[in-house]
Amino acid sequence: MPDLIARLAFNTRVRSRIWKQLAKLLQNRMHLHEALRLLKFQAEERKSPLVKVYAHILHKLGRGRTLGAALDGLASREETLLISSAQDSSRLAGGLLLASKVLDAKSSIRKSLI
C-alpha cells in the first residue's frame, strides 16, 4: 500500500482527472498496463507522490488482480464497483468516465451544501 503522502495526493479531484486520462488512452487503443506505465512515467517526471500509487496498481495488476481490486483502499467503494463491473463487461473506458462523473457530481453537491 502506498504511503500516507501518496494516498493523500490521490484525492477525489486527482482521481477524477486520472479516470478521464485513462479512459481517453483506452479509447485510443492503448492497453491498461501501457496506459498506467505512461501515467507513472509522467508522475516520475513531475516528481509526484502519485508514482507510488501507480506502482502499487501496476503491481496488483501484475499479480492478476482487476483494476477495481487494485484500487481497493485507495478509491471509494462506488468507484471500485463501477470500475470493476465495467472491466468485467469489457467497457472499462466507459466505466472510468462514469466514475469520474460520479466523483465530479459528489464534489459539486458538497460544494453547494457548504
Locate the predicted segments by residue.
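Catalytic metal-binding core of the metallo-beta-lactamase
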Residues: M1-I114
